[in-house]
Amino acid sequence: MSHGDTIRVDASVRAKCGTGSARALRAAGLIPAVVYGKNRDAVNISLSHADFLKKCRTLPIFSQLIKLCIDGKEEFALTKEIQKHPVSGAVSHVDFQFVDRGAEIKVEVPLVFLNEQKCAGVKLGGALNILHRSLLIRCAPDAIPQSLEVDLLDLAIGHSIHVSDLALPETMQVAMKEENPVVASVSATAAVEEAKEDGAPEESAQGQGAAEAQETGK
């Protein structure tokens, strides 16, 4: 999927609410859900469990615009929360938020890390630290990216990649509260530190030997 793509979800308005009604829907293979939005009344809906679960497993359901077809009427929304049964993993409830396609929105976009095994610092024995696996951005609904890439290839020990280092499209802005947070870093491990310490005396001895040889030759 690319910018501007939508995920279609068919739904129907449900007249009844409450625990008993929700239980009956689930028994019939449906998911109780709600769509809410600013200056709009919430709409209680139901949707196919099998269809929605498949979309959850194969599509970026949280970071892509949803085209809700409610009894044939199209509405655009974002998936805000998915509740699942703690044992079976079945989806028990979904919250959607209405979206105005003419206004910018905030959305959490997943980060995809490239070259983790080829990372310069990791190859030298450093430990890779991933501090953020998603990024809160502000953009138009039609410009939501499926994901954002972070290349770790040249990341050395003791160095970090900040949000400001990412090549973000001009159509979006970072909306995180923390100013320029670290996305990933490589820290020295105990083995790396020990290797440095083991090498230090040898270098010192070599330097002392060279100095003594130079003094003898005078």
UniProtKB/Swiss-Prot annotation:
Protein keywords: Ribonucleoprotein, Ribosomal protein, RNA-binding, rRNA-binding
On assembly, the entry states:
Part of the 50S ribosomal subunit; part of the 5S rRNA/L5/L18/L25 subcomplex. Contacts the 5S rRNA. Binds to the 5S rRNA independently of L5 and L18.
Any one Gene Ontology cellular component term annotated for this protein: cytosolic large ribosomal subunit
A GO molecular function term, named singly, is: 5S rRNA binding
In the record, the note on similarity to other proteins reads:
Belongs to the bacterial ribosomal protein bL25 family. CTC subfamily.
Q: What does this protein do?
A: This is one of the proteins that binds to the 5S RNA in the ribosome where it forms part of the central protuberance.
InterPro entries named among the record's database cross-references: Rbsml_bL25/Gln-tRNA_synth_N (IPR020056), Ribosomal_bL25/Gln-tRNA_synth (IPR011035), Ribosomal_bL25_b-dom (IPR020057), Ribosomal_bL25_C (IPR037121), Ribosomal_bL25_long (IPR001021), Ribosomal_L25_dom (IPR029751), Ribosomal_uL5_bac-type (IPR020930)
Query: What HAMAP family would the database entry show?
Result: Ribosomal_bL25_CTC
The name this protein goes by in its record: Large ribosomal subunit protein bL25
Q: List this protein's GO terms for biological process.
A: translation
Q: Where is the composition biased (Low complexity)?
A: 202-218
Region: Disordered; residue ranges are 187-218
